[in-house]
Swiss-Prot record:
Residues that span the membrane, as ranges: 38-58
Alphabetical keyword list: Adaptive immunity, Calcium, Cell adhesion, Disulfide bond, Endocytosis, Glycoprotein, Immunity, Innate immunity, Lectin, Mannose-binding, Membrane, Metal-binding, Receptor, Repeat, Signal-anchor, Transmembrane, Transmembrane helix
Extracellular side: 59-404
Entry remark concerning the domains of this protein: The tandem repeat domain, also called neck domain, mediates oligomerization.
Protein name per the record: CD209 antigen
Sequence repeat residues: 96-118, 119-141, 142-164, 165-187, 188-210, 211-233, 234-257
Subunit record text: Homotetramer. Interacts with C1QBP; the interaction is indicative for a C1q:C1QBP:CD209 signaling complex. Interacts with ICAM2 and ICAM3 by binding to mannose-like carbohydrates. Interacts (via C-type lectin domain) with CEACAM1 (via Lewis X moieties); this interaction is regulated by the glycosylation pattern of CEACAM1 on cell types and regulates contact between dendritic cells and neutrophils.
Cysteines joined through disulfide linkages: C256-C267, C284-C377, C356-C369
SMART domains: CLECT
SUPFAM superfamilies cross-referenced by the UniProt entry: C-type lectin-like
Organism placement in taxonomy: Eukaryota, Metazoa, Chordata, Craniata, Vertebrata
Organism encoding this protein: Nomascus concolor (Black crested gibbon)
Its job: Pathogen-recognition receptor expressed on the surface of immature dendritic cells (DCs) and involved in initiation of primary immune response. Thought to mediate the endocytosis of pathogens which are subsequently degraded in lysosomal compartments. The receptor returns to the cell membrane surface and the pathogen-derived antigens are presented to resting T-cells via MHC class II proteins to initiate the adaptive immune response. Probably recognizes in a calcium-dependent manner high mannose N-linked oligosaccharides in a variety of pathogen antigens.
Gene Ontology CC terms: membrane
Signal peptide location: none
Amino acid sequence: MSDSKEPSVQQLGLLEEEQLRGLGFRQTRGYKSLAGCLGHGALVLQLLSFTLLAGLLIQVSKFPSSISQEQSKQDAIYQNLTQLKAAVGELSEKSKLQEIYQELTQLKAAVGELPEKSKQQEIYQELTQLKAAVGELPEKSKQQEIYQELTQLKAAVGELPEKSKQQEIYQELTRLKAAVGELPEKSQQQEIYQELTQLKAAVGELPEKSKQQEIYQELTRLKAAVGELPEKSKQQEIYQELTQLKAAVERLCRPCPWEWTFFQGNCYFMSNSQRDWHDSVTACQEVGAQLVVIKSAEEQNFLQLQSSRSNRFAWMGLSDLNQEGTWQWVDGSPLSPSFKQYWNRGEPNNVGEEDCAEFSGNGWNDDKCNLAKFWICKKSAASCSRDEEQFLSPAPATPNPPPA
């Protein structure tokens, strides 16, 4: 390797020598030494390059530690910035802070003017409660609604009568309460009223107009007396008179029992409970009557009106149970062709084995016999003599109405 390089060095030396000669330099011993040194210049340059590279590597090897230190320093700065940003984020805008500061200043001045410590404590507690209450206030629309209601209430209070008028009303209420306290108990008042009502109805059915008029006048006077309600002893006296009058009326001849309605010589009972058609027939038979059989247009109009007023569907004694399409009454009589006009439009239609007739709205309807409905019983009214003795004699025994 050294042998191959020596010719190149020699050639470089010869070339340099020729160039120097061309420039007027003379060849001397020193001159030859300089040429030799220059022949070794490439090697020196290589050594310098290696030296610089080694130094550079050493410096680069030191960079990671400095970079790591710089990074940790940057992290610390970043953390400080983050904390500062969070603290700044909690602050309100400057104007808001100024407003709060001013309010605090005013509050401090006001507190300085407060009375003794106990009073300050009381005010502080009230402020705390007020603050809590304000925090619980609803949204603005709800507040507006409450405000309007308060305004209306204030206006209503403003319309109240003056204090003296209120006092007068209060005294009047007190006197009324005392008067009510002197009345007999409610059950007895109710009993008196019911007996008056029943007596009035019974008197309305009595024969002989002159006798009815006398009793009716007596009842009117008694009713007026009860309406005035004098002291308790007087009320007791009236109650005893009513009891005696009721006993006298019970001995009178009445064409129909209590709770029955008289019409054209017959008595009718309108039930207050419901049964199927067959049980309704039985209920009427048990009181000496029958499920109503209609004999005239007047009777039909009377019964239809009673049913419509009470808004009830009520059984009548009509069915086609024996033969489909052939309607007959419970007394065995067939339905008169002239009565077919009382059927509601489209009836009877026998939808689902509807074999029994009822009062429905303004006419008749056929329905299933096993359905529970109200019912109407009918029987003849009792006859009464116009003779005074007969008039005051006990009436013939009459069955009680069927259980309603």
